[in-house]
Structures are given as C-alpha cells and as structure tokens.
C-alpha cells in the first residue's frame, strides 16, 4: 500500500481542513485564537476557589529570600541569577566559593537588568548567557548575553566581559531573532539565526548554521550546515576537549523528540554525522570519549 496521498486527494483534504489557518503560527488569526484560548483557560482556573491561595503560595515560593541561590562556578566564583520584589527583572551576581558556603553570602552585582532596561528604554528580560574562556588562558570570560524585549522567544545577543562587568565595545552583537550560538574560539562564534527570507523553519527557528569571525560583518559568515524547512530547527554546539580544542558541531532537530548531531572536522567542507541515537544528547567529553545521555536503548556497533 502506498504511504503517500495522491496530490488531488491531498488538495481536497487541505481544502476541507477547517483549521489549516493555524499552520500560519505567526499569523494574526492564529495568534488571536491563542489569546482567546488563554483567556478562556485563565478564567476557568481563576473560578476555582483554591486559585488565589495556590497563586499566592507559588509566588511566595518563587520570590522567597530563603530559596536556594543555585549557581554556576567560573574562575572560583559562583554566578547566580536572582529576582525578588526589588529586582523584578533580576540581578546577575557572583560571590566567592568561601562566601557562598556561608548562610549570608556577600554578593557582587555583575549586571542589573532593571537598571539596564531603564537606561536603554527597553523591556529587557534576561534569557541566559553563553560564556567562554580558552583553557589555560589568563584572559577573563567573555559571554554572549541573550536579552528579550518583552519576554518573547526572539532575542538579541551581546558580548559581555565578566572581568570589567561591561558590554564589550565593538564586540559581537546579533540582531533580534529566534537564534542560537556557541563559542568556537575567543574570536569566533557559531551562529544560527534569521539569515533572511526562506531561512526559518515552519516553527520559526533557524536551520542554517554559520561561522562568524570577530570584526567581520555578520553577512559574511561562512555557512557550515543547512537543514530543512521541515525541521524544528538547527542549532550550533561546541564541546571543549581536554587539550583546549573546541569540537564544533550542530544539532538538527528533525522533530520535537529526535535530533541528528553533526560535527565539523577541521579542514573539511562537509559535516560528519555522529553515530548516536536520535533520542540522545551529547553532554561533554572525558578522556577522549564522548559522553551521551540516552532517552532510548542503544547498542553501539
């Protein structure tokens, strides 16, 4: 039995589908429908007599001064993103490991997002930072900080110096888009973004990854891999080896649940696919071996 629909029948099916307009995920009609469904759902939830108490408890838990300040360790410092009633947009801050072990750590502010939003007149929402320093280098960390104007998926990314606690003058900056990036070297970024008409998937995410050198215009970036418009998206990735080299690659999400992983061999023009299951995630490298977390059984060849 054929597993495809004859074109005439496919056209008839499309014509009879009353919800085909929802495929235009950014269209006014689809977004208006979503807003209506959200309002309907919220009204239903708020009608529950327990709603107010649950909401109050959730807000108190999320904004409690007693909650654990989870952090990331860099150069012997613990970095933490913190929000409270005073700092609604949040603080990026750091403290020493010794101070962090105390009941009341002494935090140093790295970046105040409320202050940044007020200074720049933007509704900035912090969406994370991708930081890098070459192994064995005395240089400080540089980070690509992702900022969303209003909390949407699209962000701008700006280079930030953790040593000076300032955005880098004439540093890397990407325009607003649904995008992803990874450091390939102190002066090289792997970028997936909106490269123009026809470069986004139906989900609105990029499917082309390029290599961008410092000082060069973004438009001159070298294409490394091109996925397909039917993918969920394609994003760059980089894994640091024990000798300091960077393993450059990309993650091509065929579906929401499955991903193909590629690496870009130095001196080669074509990417090479890693022979790992589509329901898995590379987590790092240890003693020359790739560490992979699995979401399905795997019997390596």
Language-model regions, residue ranges each:
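Beta-propeller folds
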Residues: 1-301
């Amino acid at each position: 039995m054929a597993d495809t629909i004859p074109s005439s029948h496919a056209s008839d099916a499309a014509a009879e589908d009353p919800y085909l307009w929802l495929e235009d995920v950014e269209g006014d009609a689809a977004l208006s429908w979503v807003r209506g469904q959200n309002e309907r759902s919220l009204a239903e939830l708020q009608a529950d007599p327990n709603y107010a108490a649950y909401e109050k408890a959730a807000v108190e838990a999320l904004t409690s001064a007693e909650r654990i300040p989870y952090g990331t360790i860099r150069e012997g410092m613990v970095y933490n993103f913190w929000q409270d009633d005073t700092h609604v947009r949040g603080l990026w801050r750091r403290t020493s490991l010794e101070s962090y072990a105390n009941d009341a750590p002494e935090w140093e502010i790295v970046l105040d997002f409320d202050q940044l939003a007020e200074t720049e007149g933007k509704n900035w929402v912090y969406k994370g930072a991708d930081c890098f320093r070459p192994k064995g280098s005395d240089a400080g960390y540089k980070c690509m900080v992702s900022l969303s104007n209003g909390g949407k998926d699209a962000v701008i990314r700006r280079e930030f110096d953790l040593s000076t606690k300032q955005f880098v003058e004439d540093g890397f900056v990407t325009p607003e888009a649904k995008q992803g990036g990874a450091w390939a070297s102190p002066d090289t970024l792997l970028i997936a973004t909106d490269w123009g008409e026809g470069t986004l998937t139906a989900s609105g995410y990029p499917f082309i990854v390029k290599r961008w050198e410092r000082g060069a215009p973004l438009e001159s970036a070298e294409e490394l891999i091109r996925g397909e418009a039917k993918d969920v998206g394609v994003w760059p990735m980089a894994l640091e080896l024990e000798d300091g080299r960077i393993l450059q690659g990309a993650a091509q999400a065929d579906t929401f649940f499955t991903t193909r992983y590629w690496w870009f061999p130095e001196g080669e023009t074509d990417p090479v696919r890693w022979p790992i299951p589509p329901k898995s995630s590379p987590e790092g490298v240890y003693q020359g071996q790739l560490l992979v977390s699995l979401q399905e059984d795997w019997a390596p060849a």
